[in-house]
């Protein structure tokens, strides 16, 4: 049985993609698979209830009127995120599905009672470290240029939650029209930097910090998706058992590609991702300014086109899965300059699968696949010689089928 954030199209991102692909492959390998995820807040009732919603090989159930999802800006009201519930509802659900093991992909939206009931029933629990929610109120552990993974205190939670939305507003995003609401978020006013507002956030997060630490203590095995994520978790948790298991998904496969870089007058250097500080977008712009324009072309993908960028940066905006081959055909060097301690980073494997050379920040978990020459601590370390000397990587990509076999073996040994 899996607990995940949800399914496409209502939820997106690497966590959702990975958990869905893993479940589908487990079904293909003959396993019976159940999925539980947070659902909408019912308007006509506040009663917490679990309902079976459909079955397409995976039996899917949803938690209605569960805990709020801290999808934006941290946690404003700590008490709302540790509300007690009827543990009997979880017990009835677990009795019905009778899982051999529970695989947890996130702590968002799930009550502590789920874990206490599972332990009472003797069900083993494994946890994949997709992000840092629970260790912190922000999945990234990062705000305004600072990673808080080494400074995790009550005051840190206050600072990380200075831009938090109200619980009522967060619950709006648990409706099925969430994707539309997400598009509208850019029109909603939010503070971008911590200022004197920090003095106004006097919430006490100590009990919530202990609440999540107790939940983590119920995990029988941690599946760390990189050395980096293991380092962050081990610094903030005690007495855990786990191992590094690099993740995959159904789109990661070795492709036969032609090296077009020799046919070009200039190497094409690109950034793929949101135009956000934590992803290193502005670091990429710094790099562009530092490199000679007569020797390199620059491009960005994966976010809305910006009006204020110089015309020597080609902006291709967002793209869909069908276009992905054409995207990578036009990239020689991909820069992955994340500032947050990114637990993995599927974009690295994706690029490598297309034969694209990757230069990644030390903050990217998937740097585990790169030679040290392709890893940088600061964007200023990258120069013309660094790019020309960057190494192409030859390595065996694990398919989702192979990865699933590995995960099932871990289940059997927990």
Where are these regions (language model features)?
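Short hydrophobic beta-strand element within catalytic cores of glycosyltransferases
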Residues: 348, 357-360
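Membrane-proximal helix-turn-helix segments that form the acceptor-binding/catalytic region
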Residues: 92, 148-221
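N-terminal subdomain of nucleotide-sugar transferases
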Residues: 1-55, 121-124, 286-292
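Conserved active-site histidine-acidic residue motif and adjacent donor-binding/catalytic loop
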Residues: 303-304, 313-328, 339, 364
């Amino acid at each position: 049985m899996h607990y995940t954030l949800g399914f496409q199209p209502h939820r997106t991102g690497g966590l959702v993609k990975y958990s869905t692909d893993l479940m589908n492959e487990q079904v293909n390998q003959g396993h019976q698979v159940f999925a539980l995820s947070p659902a909408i807040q019912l308007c006509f009732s506040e009663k917490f209830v679990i309902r079976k919603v459909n079955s397409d090989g995976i039996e899917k159930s949803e938690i209605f009127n569960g805990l709020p999802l801290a999808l934006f800006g941290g946690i404003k009201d700590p008490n709302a995120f540790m509300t007690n519930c009827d543990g009997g509802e979880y017990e009835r659900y677990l009795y019905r599905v009778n899982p051999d093991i529970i695989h947890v992909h996130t702590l968002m939206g799930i009550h502590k009672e789920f874990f206490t009931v599972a332990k009472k029933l003797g069900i083993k629990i494994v946890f994949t470290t997709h992000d840092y929610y629970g260790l912190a109120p922000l999945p990234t552990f990062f705000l305004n240029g600072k990673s808080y993974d080494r400074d995790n205190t009550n005051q840190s939670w206050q600072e990380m939650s200075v831009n938090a939305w109200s619980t009522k507003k967060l619950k709006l995003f648990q409706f099925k029209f969430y994707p539309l609401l997400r598009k509208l978020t850019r029109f909603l006013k939010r503070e971008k930097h911590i200022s004197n507002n920090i003095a106004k956030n006097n919430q006490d997060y100590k009990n919530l910090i202990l609440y999540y630490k107790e939940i983590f203590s119920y995990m029988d095995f941690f599946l760390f998706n990189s050395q980096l994520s293991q380092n962050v978790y081990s610094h903030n948790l005690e007495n855990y058992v786990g191992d590094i298991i690099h993740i995959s998904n159904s789109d990661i496969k070795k492709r036969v590609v032609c090296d077009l870089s020799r046919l070009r007058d200039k190497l094409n250097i690109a950034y793929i991702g949101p135009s956000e500080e934590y992803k290193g977008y502005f670091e990429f712009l710094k790099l562009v300014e530092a490199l000679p324009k007569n020797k390199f072309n620059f491009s960005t993908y994966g976010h809305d086109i910006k009006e204020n960028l110089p015309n020597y940066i080609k902006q291709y905006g967002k793209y869909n899965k069908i276009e992905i081959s054409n995207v990578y055909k036009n990239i020689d060097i991909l820069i992955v300059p994340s500032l947050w301690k990114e637990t993995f980073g599927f974009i690295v494997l994706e690029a490598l699968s297309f034969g694209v050379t990757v230069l990644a920040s030390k903050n990217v978990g998937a740097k585990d696949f790169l030679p040290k020459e392709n890893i940088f601590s600061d964007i200023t370390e990258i120069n013309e010689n660094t790019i020309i000397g960057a190494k192409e990587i030859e390595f065996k990509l694990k398919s989702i089928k192979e990865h699933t076999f590995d995960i099932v073996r871990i289940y059997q040994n927990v």
